Structures are given as C-alpha cells and as structure tokens.
Amino acid sequence: MKKLSEFGKGLYVAAKFSESTLDALEELQRSLKLPNPVPRDKLHTTIVYSRVNVPYKVASGSFEIADKGKLTVFETQSGNRALVLEMDSDYLSARHSYAKALGASYDYPDYRPHITLSYNIGVLNFSGEYKVPVVLDREYSEELDLEWSDKD
C-alpha cells in the first residue's frame, strides 16, 4: 500500500518492445541514416507522463499494438527537432485513457503514441509511412523525473 506522501511524486509509464520490433526500428534508423539515433535499449513509447501519481497497474504480454507508423518531427523541450514514428494504436490510447480515468495529468492537449527514433535530427527533414510491426514486450512504471532532458 502506498503512503499518501508518495502520491505527490508523479508517475511515468512506458511500453518496451519485443526483440523483433527493436530489430525493425534499428533497421529503420540505419536506412534513414539518422543522426543521433536513440539506442536500442532506450527505444520506448511513453504512455503516462503525469505530475500526479495514480494507482496505475502495468500490463505485460506480447502482442502487436501497431503495424505501421508515419515519420513526424516534434520539437523537444530543449529546442531540438526529434524524429518520431507516430502510430495509431488503440491499445496505447486505451492505456493512456485508463491513466487519465485514474486522475493522471498530461502536459499536452492530445496523446499521440510514438517512438522517438532520434532526439536531434538538426535541419534534416523526413516523411513517409513505414510498415513496422510494433510488438509490446511489457510496460514499466517509475517516479516521474521532471529534470529529465533529451540532452542526456
């Protein structure tokens, strides 16, 4: 049972992927010749980024949560241009909605499931849709780190 003081620390939940998905993502990074590719062990999708800690139960299991994605450029908090693979995933959207129903906060107007491929692509531009079978390996949760930076 959590102590009341632990609920003020915030919550971060992310999805990690199967080895075959990680292989496909690394191949995509290589084929695009991405500068500053996110390392294999850091590839993930954020599900919850909440300044409020809620009693979220992480899920496990291995199943496909998306079969393709489109390349999108996001501006990061540090002002860099990140390249992400944005996905339509009913599963990830439902898990995010579950957290919101529990009272989780979210700093952005919409939840857009994605996997960051590079946190800094500079002035380069990328576009297109790519077939990448995204298979969930597990979810994990930890205390929200408001000091995290994509510069790390």
UniProtKB/Swiss-Prot annotation:
GO function terms (MF aspect): hydrolase activity
UniProt binding sites for 3',3'-cGAMP: Y12, F74, Y108, E142, W148
Alphabetized InterPro entries for the sequence: Acb1-like_C, Cyclic_Pdiesterase
Keyword Cell division: no
Example of a GO biological process term: symbiont-mediated suppression of host innate immune response
Disulfide bonds, paired cysteine numbers: none
Cell membrane found in the keyword field: no
Positions contributing to 3',3'-cUAMP binding: Y12, F74, Y108, E142, W148
Catalytic residue positions: H44, T46, H114, T116
Keywords assigned by UniProt, alphabetized: Host-virus interaction, Hydrolase, Inhibition of host innate immune response by virus, Viral immunoevasion
Enzymatic reactions: 3',3'-cUAMP + H2O = U[3'-5']pAp[3'] + H(+); 3',3',3'-c-tri-AMP + H2O = A[3'-5']pA[3'-5']pAp[3'] + H(+); 3',3',3'-cAAG + H2O = G[3'-5']pA[3'-5']pAp[3'] + H(+); 3',3',3'-cAAG + H2O = A[3'-5']pG[3'-5']pAp[3'] + H(+)
Annotated family: Belongs to the anti-CBASS protein Acb1 family.
Function: Counteracts the host CBASS antiviral defense system. Phosphodiesterase that enables metal-independent hydrolysis of the host cyclic di- and trinucleotide CBASS signals such as 3'3'-cGAMP, 3'3'cUA, and 3'3'3'-cAAA. Does not cleave cGG or cA4. Besides evasion of the CBASS system, might also enable evasion of the type III CRISPR systems that use cA3 signals.
Protein name stated in the entry: Anti-CBASS protein Acb1
Native species: Erwinia phage FBB1
